[in-house]
Amino acid sequence: MRLHHLLLALLFLVLSAGSGFTQGVRNFVTCRINRGFCVPIRCPGHRRQIGTCLGPRIKCCR
């Protein structure tokens, strides 16, 4: 039963973070939801930056 509570809390966290997507991606969870990945350098190849992960130096690329 505790697992259900944890998953419900995680769902609320993800949904509340996704509601402000007009401001861009700002954490790992929303980066992954938006089919991105986090890198500590600039985005490789033809990928573009769609936000940041865990601070301004780690980019979310898609």
From Swiss-Prot:
PANTHER family for the chain: BETA-DEFENSIN (PTHR20515), DEFENSIN BETA 4A (PTHR20515:SF2)
Cystine crosslinks: 31-60, 38-53, 43-61
Primary localization class, coarse: secreted
Listed name of the protein: Beta-defensin 7
Keyword DNA repair: no
Family: Belongs to the beta-defensin family.
Pyrrolidone carboxylic acid PTM positions: 23
GO cellular component, one term: extracellular space
Localisation per UniProt entry: Secreted
GO MF term set: CCR6 chemokine receptor binding; chemoattractant activity
Signal peptide: 1-22
